[in-house]
């Protein structure tokens, strides 16, 4: 699923007014977030709605309706953002990847696993997460370090993709893990991967956008929440994510470009989480926060 941006181009003052309208209509959505930014090359302002959803047409019509009163003269433009081609990215590289105690390998590399390593077998396929991307590797490394420092009795992997992080958490911690994704193909692939890795109980899969499912209250609150999604949805869902975190719990966030980390930290500091550690991998950051 690609990230789509619907936006209007205007002056700074008018962009701020448009942003107010956008924020009001998308306040309750998990998958759409409104923001404004300057395009320095053209010296114009853009008020945008970013989303990862199949419901672009419905978002567009709600937006058009809301802008029709005061801003109908501003055309709604559209951009497909290139940095979320998860499936193409999951096909990058096939050699085993090592992070923390984990080695993620394809079925052709079973003999490369060394004694003492926690092996996870994932073949590149229809969902993101072979371990090659800096965000996945960062989460694996952070997971190993959090497990050394804090007791974890259950975990949530939000945006599970191939299921790699959920399987890693289960193999490392031996605790119940809930794994969810907005994309039903991902949850099916993740469940298949779990079976291939010998995980038959203790790992639950569900398809849900953000926290919109009763499965979170049934299985939570969680001592550990891992969310490798994207900076904007992570900021948007900060209040719900923290509401599902157990007292003393840990959060691992990734999918964040280095330059976006301050905004993400500010959103979670605003929910009373404290920064514990940041890891950098290929321009991406993975952040550990605690309650
Ligand atoms: C970068 S991939 C991460 C996959 C895997 N967890 C990993 O670390 O390699 C992000 C995943 O989050 C899912 N996703 C995006 N927005 C979501 C949302 N609002 N709620 C749940 N899942 C979401 C995508 O479908 C995708 O599978």
UniProtKB/Swiss-Prot annotation:
Keyword DNA repair assigned: no
Q: Which Gene3D superfamilies match?
A: Vaccinia Virus protein VP39
Tell me yes or no: is Magnesium among this UniProt entry's keywords.
no
- Per the record, GO CC terms? cytoplasm
Show the GO MF annotations.
protein-lysine N-methyltransferase activity
Its predominant location is cytoplasm
Q: Which reaction does it catalyse?
A: L-lysyl-[protein] + 3 S-adenosyl-L-methionine = N(6),N(6),N(6)-trimethyl-L-lysyl-[protein] + 3 S-adenosyl-L-homocysteine + 3 H(+)
Where does it reside?
Answer: Cytoplasm
Question: Which Pfam families has this protein been placed in?
Answer: PrmA
Q: Which UniProt keywords apply?
A: Cytoplasm, Methyltransferase, S-adenosyl-L-methionine, Transferase
> EC no.?
2.1.1.-
- What CDD domains does its record include? AdoMet_MTases
InterPro entries annotated for this entry?
A: Ribosomal_L11_MeTrfase_PrmA, Ribosomal_PrmA_MeTrfase, SAM-dependent_MTases_sf
Q: Which residues bind S-adenosyl-L-methionine?
A: 136, 159, 181, 228
An individual GO BP term: methylation
Q: What does this protein do?
A: Methylates ribosomal protein L11.
The Swiss-Prot or TrEMBL record describes its family as follows: Belongs to the methyltransferase superfamily. PrmA family.
**Protein name as catalogued:** Ribosomal protein L11 methyltransferase
